[in-house]
Amino acid sequence: MKAAVLHGQEDVRIEETDAPILQTGEVRIRIGTALTCGTDLKVYRRGYHARMITPPAVFGHEFSGTITEMAEDVAGWKIGDRVVAANSAPCGECLYCKNHQPNLCDDLLFLNGAYAESIVVPARIVEKNLLPLSTDIAFPDAAL
């Protein structure tokens, strides 16, 4: 699949990449819209983000789209569902999460890869931060 891959400081290349294989609890989403935010710009200028992305890696984290594939154990979703996903999910188990401060999570899971034809959403994000979209919400509006 075609993807925008971050290789380092101000170095993003359009490349053919292998589509990741689904693991337990994951879904594949065909990208409807992928947007660029201030964090993307900072990462592009710096060439990395200490916790979020290590080059080379498919870039982008704000997106919406349609589920095209699901691991066998995924429940509550179906192929063709329109969705938006947050780019992270807390662990729910660390001291910060248990104290209702998930933004400080010791094991915050980040998701990148929206600047591609499709993205695989990890199980924790599917469970905690994958949201359905009604048909009256456009993909660009949802990704915002």
Give residue spans per PLM region.
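N-terminal glycine-rich cofactor-binding segment
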Residues: 5-21, 38-69, 84, 98-112
